[in-house]
C-alpha cells in the first residue's frame, strides 16, 4: 500500500500540496488528475522520494520513505517502475540497451538472461524486432512503449506513470491506455497514473483523485467521478469535453 497522510509542500512561498491524504491499496490503479500546476507531478515526486514533505508522511509498504536511510530508499525504489512523460530514453543507446540498462546496473544477470528478459518485455508492449533501432528512429508512441518496457523489466510491484499520453494523438493515446490496463492485469501491480486526460483516467483507473489548489477534492470511482456535482469537478470534466470536440 502507498499512503500519504497530511502531506504539505511549499515551493518559493507557494503551498503546492495542502494536507494531502491519499491511500492506494495494493493491486489497484489510482489516477491523479487536475489542471496544470495543481500539484500532480509534485505528488509523484513525493511518492518516489525525490521530494520530502514540509509536514506529513509518505508511506510505501508501511515505510516512511523520507525518514529511511539512503540504502533503504534505494531498495524501495528498486521495486518501482517509472514511465516518464517523454519516455526519457537515452538517445545514444538502442531501444534494446535502454531497456537492458536497469538489469545491467541493478542485477547480476548474465547477458543471455538480460537479452531474454528484454525481448520478453518488448513483446509485452508490441515492439518485437525493434531492439536495434535508436530512439530517433521510432515514433513518439513507440518511445512511450519502450519506456514502459524499461519500467517493467525488473518486475516492479509499483508502476508510476507521469502523463503517459501527453503529446500523443487520440489513437496512440488509447493504445497506451490499453497497455497500462493490460500491464495491471498481467503483472498485478499497484499503479499511480498522473494525467490531465480523463479518457485515460476513466479507462485505467480503479479510482480517480482530483487535486485542486493543493488539496484532494474528490477520490471516487470513475463512474462516481463523472457524475459528481461539485462545480470544480464539473468544470474540469466539461473543459475536457470541449477540448475533444
Identify the meaning behind each predicted range.
Residues 92-101:
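Short coil-to-helix segment of the ABC ATPase nucleotide-binding domain corresponding to the Q-loop/switch region
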Residues 159-162:
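Catalytic Walker B motif of ABC-type/P-loop ATPase nucleotide-binding domains
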Residues 48:
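Helix-to-loop junction immediately C-terminal to a conserved catalytic motif
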Residues 153-157:
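A short, proline-enriched helix->beta-strand linker immediately N-terminal to the Walker B motif
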Residues 134-138, 142:
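Conserved ABC ATPase signature
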Residues 63-64, 111-130, 181:
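Conserved ABC ATPase "signature" region
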Amino acid at each position: 500500500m502507498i499512503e500519504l497522510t497530511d502531506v504539505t509542500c511549499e515551493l518559493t512561498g507557494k503551498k503546492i500540496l495542502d494536507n494531502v491524504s491519499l491511500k492506494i491499496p495494493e493491486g489497484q490503479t489510482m489516477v491523479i488528475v487536475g489542471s496544470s500546476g495543481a500539484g500532480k507531478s509534485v505528488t509523484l515526486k513525493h511518492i518516489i522520494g525525490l521530494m520530502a514533505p514540509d509536514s506529513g508522511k509518505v508511506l510505501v509498504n508501511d515505510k516512511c520513505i523520507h525518514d529511511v536511510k539512503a540504502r533503504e530508499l534505494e531498495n524501495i525504489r528498486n521495486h518501482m517502475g517509472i514511465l516518464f512523460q517523454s519516455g526519457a530514453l537515452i538517445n545514444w543507446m538502442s531501444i534494446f540497451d535502454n531497456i537492458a540498462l536497469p538489469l545491467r546496473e541493478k542485477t547480476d544477470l548474465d547477458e543471455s538472461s538480460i537479452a531474454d528478459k528484454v525481448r520478453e518485455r518488448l513483446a509485452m508492449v508490441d515492439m518485437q524486432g525493434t531492439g536495434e533501432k535508436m530512439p530517433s528512429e521510432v515514433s513518439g508512441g513507440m518511445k512511450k512503449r519502450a519506456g514502459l518496457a524499461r519500467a517493467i523489466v525488473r518486475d516492479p510491484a509499483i508502476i508510476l506513470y507521469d502523463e503517459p499520453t501527453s503529446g500523443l494523438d487520440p489513437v496512440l493515446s488509447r493504445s497506451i491506455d490499453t497497455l497500462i490496463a493490460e500491464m495491471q492485469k498481467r503483472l498485478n501491480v499497484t499503479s499511480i497514473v498522473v494525467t490531465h486526460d480523463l479518457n485515460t483516467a476513466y479507462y485505467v483507473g480503479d479510482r480517480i483523485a482530483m487535486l485542486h489548489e493543493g488539496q484532494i477534492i474528490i477520490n471516487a470511482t470513475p463512474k462516481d467521478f463523472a457524475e459528481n456535482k461539485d462545480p470544480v469537478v464539473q468544470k474540469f470534466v466539461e473543459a475536457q469535453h470541449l477540448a475533444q470536440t
